[in-house]
């Protein structure tokens, strides 16, 4: 499913280039040939880290969760037993994921973690859809580890599955590189999160997403404006 999902975005925008650079955050195209990338090409690099590490680790978490449920190691609740509670857990998953992502992302920006793991993802200064899960396996283990909450609290296999798919497919939101995709001359769909694009551009801003305003609270928010850019420069200068 992930392969189909990312391909449906990547092919029209980056292979066929059906709308050129219209609505693209960065008017340049990703670096196709660069020594820093695995196999010296961004798309090959992204496919390798996503498909050979990301998808297997995602799958391993899913299989382990199902095995725990099936073997009775962890209990689960049925919708018919507590429909309100079931729905509340479902609705809280995006918020929990937001908090979990912010915490692990800050951890990944610690110098030693960045060097051994997160630098793989940050090769993509000009990201595309396949950059979403292009991570070192250590980062994949942390990124998908949010599902462990369902091994602790009473939930259902549906919640674990939804959580993992929300993480896996939802990662595209900040990496597509286009604000909108044109379906025809009059119709377009919103695609990407400018907030995370700026993180790839400047590194030291927008560690979280927008549901919970962690970056506003901790002074690392950047909205692309000159004012916020100046604040970022002052913060980094004082940090030095």
Task: Tell me what each language-model feature is.
Residues 1-108, 116-119, 123-145, 151, ...:
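Non-catalytic, topology-defining segments of multipass membrane proteins
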Residues 109, 122-126, 179, 200-203:
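Alpha-helical and His/Cys-centered functional microenvironments
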Residues 110, 120-122, 164-170:
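Active/binding-pocket-proximal capping segment
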Residues 153-212, 217:
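Functionally important transmembrane alpha-helices
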């Amino acid at each position: 499913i992930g392969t189909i999902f990312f391909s449906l975005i990547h092919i029209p925008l980056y292979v066929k280039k059906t709308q050129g650079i219209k609505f693209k955050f960065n008017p340049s195209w990703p670096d196709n040939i660069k020594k820093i990338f695995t196999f010296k090409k961004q798309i090959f690099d992204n496919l390798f880290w996503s498909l050979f590490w990301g998808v297997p680790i995602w799958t391993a978490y899913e299989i382990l969760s199902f095995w725990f449920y099936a073997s009775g190691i962890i209990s689960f609740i049925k919708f018919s037993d507590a429909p309100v509670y079931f729905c509340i857990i479902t609705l809280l998953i995006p918020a929990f994921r937001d908090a979990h992502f912010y915490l692990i992302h800050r951890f990944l920006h610690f110098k030693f973690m960045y060097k051994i793991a997160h630098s793989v993802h940050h090769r993509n200064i000009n990201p595309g859809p396949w950059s979403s899960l292009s991570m070192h396996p250590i980062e994949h283990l942390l990124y998908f580890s949010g599902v462990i909450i369902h091994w602790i609290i009473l939930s259902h296999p549906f919640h674990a599955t939804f959580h993992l798919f929300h993480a896996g497919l939802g990662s595209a939101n900040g990496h597509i590189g286009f604000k909108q995709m044109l379906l025809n001359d009059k119709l377009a769909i919103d695609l990407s999160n400018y907030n995370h694009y700026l993180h790839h551009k400047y590194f030291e801003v927008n560690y979280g997403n927008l549901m919970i305003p962690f970056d506003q609270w901790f002074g690392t928010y950047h909205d692309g404006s000159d004012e916020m850019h100046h604040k970022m420069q002052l913060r980094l200068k004082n940090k030095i």
